[in-house]
């Protein structure tokens, strides 16, 4: 089953899934929900391409984090999905999940330095393209 927030929210908006469950509303964050770093699949693909070029030209390897370095809360994502979809994301608030950290945001400094990579998509672009994909006919 899908567990990623944006596709789960879009499926809930489209009536393809039950209400989305928001786990935790008492984290030490501005709105009490977890903060995560959301990245567009096209940005990931660009970074992987840059990494392949780097590997071709260098010996060894590097561990490199990829992210936008921008944290967005669960509630902020749901608001953005609602704005783009034109419908409120049906959701329920629940208890925290054991082990969920309040905030996870990646540093992309090494990716910038070594690969010359910078993500091109913001949260609005991520949600907009996911919304188009989820509305497209399936064959």
Labelled PLM ranges:
Residues 1-4:
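Catalytic helix-loop patch of NAD(P)-dependent Rossmann-fold dehydrogenases
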Residues 6-139:
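C-terminal substrate-binding subdomain of Rossmann-fold SDR/epimerase-dehydratase oxidoreductases
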């Amino acid at each position: 089953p899908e567990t990623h927030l944006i596709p789960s929210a879009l499926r809930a908006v489209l009536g393809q899934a039950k209400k989305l469950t928001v786990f935790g509303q008492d984290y030490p964050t501005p709105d009490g929900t977890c903060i995560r770093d959301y990245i567009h699949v096209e940005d990931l693909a660009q970074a992987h391409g840059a990494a392949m070029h780097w590997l071709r030209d260098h010996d060894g390897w590097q561990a490199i984090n990829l992210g936008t370095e921008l944290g967005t809360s669960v509630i902020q994502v749901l608001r953005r999905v609602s704005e783009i979809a034109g419908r409120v994301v049906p959701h329920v608030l629940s208890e925290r999940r054991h082990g969920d950290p309040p905030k996870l945001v990646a540093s992309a400094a090494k990716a910038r330095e070594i690969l010359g990579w910078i993500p091109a998509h913001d949260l609005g672009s991520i949600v907009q393209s996911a919304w188009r994909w989820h509305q497209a006919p399936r064959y």
